[in-house]
Amino acid sequence: MRRFVFLAFVLVLFVIANLDSSSAQVNFSPDWGQGKRSGSSDTCAVCAQTMAQVYRLLQGLEAKLGQSRNYSR
């Protein structure tokens, strides 16, 4: 029983200590229209060439990692 009380006390202290770093939206407005989170679609355009370069880079790193694991055994 004492252990349960101690754990409950520690949990309460943990929650109180972390309340300072947490926040949430309490009031929701039904009239956002397009919404605050919706940005223009052209700003999120992904360049296919850049994505292909990143993909090739990751493939090369994966191959090197696989080789190093095989040699370390």
UniProtKB/Swiss-Prot annotation:
Chief localisation class: secreted
GO molecular function, one term: toxin activity
UniProt signal peptide: 1-24
Organism from which the protein derives: Cormocephalus westwoodi
Listed InterPro entries: Adipokinetic_hormone_CS (IPR002047), AKH/RPCH_hormone (IPR010475)
Post-translational modifications reported in the UniProt record: Contains 1 disulfide bond.
CC annotations in GO: extracellular region
Record-stated family: Belongs to the scoloptoxin-22 family.
Tissue: Expressed by the venom gland.
Record's keyword terms, sorted: Disulfide bond, Secreted, Signal, Toxin
Pfam families reported in the protein's UniProt record: Adipokin_hormo (PF06377)
Protein known as: U-scoloptoxin(22)-Cw1a
Location(s), subcellular: Secreted
